[in-house]
Amino acid sequence: MPVSRARRALLSLFILLSFTLSSCDGFSLEDIIPDLGSDPSDDVLVEVTFYVQIPLNTPEGEEIYLSTLDEVTGLGVNASAHPMEPSLGDANIDQGLVYQTTLTVPQHTIIKYRYTRQNQYAVIEHTESDEQVRYRMAQANNPLEIRDVVSKWSDTSYYWPEPGRISGIISDTTTGEPVPGMLVIGGGVQAFTTASGSYMLPGLPPGVHNLVVYAPDGSYHEIQQGAEVASQANTEANLAITPREYVDVTFLVTVPIGTPENSVRLVGNLYQLGNTYGNLPGGMNTIPSRMPKLTFAGGNQYGIIVALPVGTEIRYKYTLGDGFWNAEHTLDGSFNMRRFIVPDHSIQLNDEVLSWKSGTKDSITFDLWTPDHTPSGEEVFIQFNPYGWTTPLPMTEVAPNHWVFILFSPFDILSDLTYRYCREGECGIADDAATAGLFPAGRGVTPSAEPQYIADTVEDWAWLESAPFEYNTPLPVIRTRGEDFVTGVELMSGSKPADSVQITSAIPEVVNLNGGWIVLTPTWSLTHHNPPVIEPDPDQDPLWIDLNTMTMTALSQGLHVAIHPQPHFPEAVENWWLNAPLDFSWWNSWFDQYHAYAIHFAETAQIQGAEMLVLGGDWIAPALPGGKLADGTPSGVPADSELRWIEIMNDVNARFSGTIAWEMSLPAGDPAPEYFEHVDQVHLNWDPGFVINPDTTLEELVTIGNLSLDGEVHDFWSSWLRPGGKDLVLRIQYPSVSGWNPDCSTADDGPCYPISAFSDPAPVVVDYETGFTEQALAYQAFLSTAPNQDWVSGIISRGYYAPAILHDKSISIHGKPAEKLLRDWFLSLK
């Protein structure tokens, strides 16, 4: 029954009082945690002297600084600048001035830093490829000297001799096996080791660079050494790292009176403490969904036990938001940061948060009511915009559809700000309809010296229907297929670090679809165009740990796992290819990059226990033998491309023992390529050409589907697959729109959008209205035709958007009528 606004106000007051008062029940950590004593502080201090050589084209008369960075609060929001002095006698001035400074830090400190120049603004150092240096790293185990070279500044050109590079393999000292997912840093360039333990740091100016290998989760001891790089040369640095043991660390914290209940989290510098090692919007680097949440322990205390690696430096703080919003502060208003070295025995840390506030401004309480059709089990987040939209923060549900968030800080460095609400942290996609989109104005608020209470209501959510769907689509006639018949869903690729957490959390929903298979779609990014570079970018691609967590979770819940790697292009894939040089040198680089990409995911699938690896895809069509660009012109792929693909697939087979599948669309009548000898299955993007309007009948679609199957699809199977005994799995997809016409062959066909236009969440396609019945009808036709063909070996629904239910125009079936139809059909096959 709807609740009146007056009744909501009274209910809100009652709940808010109980929300901020300490509870008298709950368990005490004293009942389960022995008094182990606090960890003694590491009082030994060491001096670290930094020498940096700057390029000759550095503007004169400007101060040079070493900026130490705080990845817990945010690299972009809490740096400390240390002035440097010229060290004229240390190097040949004709090669660039050398500056120096000395820091005194606790022993075993990991220093994250970069160099800046100060004029009217702070000018940050950049790499040779003109990317901002994220940070360099140094470990202060003993007094030492660090020597660095600045490649260039953001406002200058590269002025050194031709750069060189550092490359190598990182292995485990105890097993000799390669170690994937390690962060390797040198010369301001960062890379993560591949599944084979390999890494490469390109674009380094000649000179000595500090090289550090660091485990994002602290699972291995760090290694640090100098590496000399010569112009146009490779410095090989193969290093062995030692794994760490783990001990239990108990965090027990006393919080201020008035702390909202069950909102205290632990945020720190390791992966398992919320660090993404990527650059999030607003200069942040941590996500609440990965931060450990503390348990109420009576009084004003909260606690948690976390297994941490011995010898690791832990930087941490307590927070009611993330490392920036609502984090703990000292009494003078500064961000508080705690530090300790994990000992070789279990310990208990007894901490006290002095204040959640900073400055003289008081808290703001956001009291939100959401509509009754908000999906059960989904969380509501609030997102703030002080100078740009920052990481969304989870609100606390105090009653059904009633959410609260109290903002305490950091008001000392903020004035006006705007905010908005969204579901499941998917701001920009699953928004409050009043503030929807990537760049909305938002709702406004100005912090003040007095506490503020803001009562908000989300009247409607973007891309979420208020009325329940009518599920009246009849189930197709079931034809029993054997256990080898492949059924499942392929996930839509993520585009931000939090997506990996949400995908992992959504795996039980995939299990409930009864399909049996989940196709994970990890990504690498095309970060450079000439020469082409494809590599993991933690800003948008999952780390090794992320993919391993997703795979292990799916396997543990009884799913078969396939890994289907995908690219992240900086622009439309067609334009990327059209704008590429496509000369012989460029093609050599492209094949080298794709080879490394394919090998990495083959080894990843083998190590992580996936049963299938899917390669190919329409995005590589210009690189296949006889490849063409989107405008129909030849791509200029080398004449020996067939041999290059054979080599790639040979190497993939040598590294992965499971099923190897190839994704593709129907070819243009060409014979099967020779590299198909190394493929076990083909996953065909089946498009029978359905055009579905409100008056379209199932019988019409079944006729069209059967014509496609009996004609072009059967011809493809009989000529490409049957001779080699290879299986054909059909990938099915249809957008949730009415009247979509996939045929763009004539100008009279009206608006034309390829299926790729609907392959991302919440696509903006104004020419079509949503059509959920149409999507379900397409699925009914798919399932009424394809499984009846003996030579079809499986059905995969592609584009399942896991993070949240969206009633959008995309191909995702999550939360739409087609999902129920597919779930029931999968179940009936069992």
Write out the residue ranges for each language-model feature.
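Substrate-binding cleft and catalytic face of glycoside hydrolase catalytic domains
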Residues: 473-481, 513-532, 545-629, 802
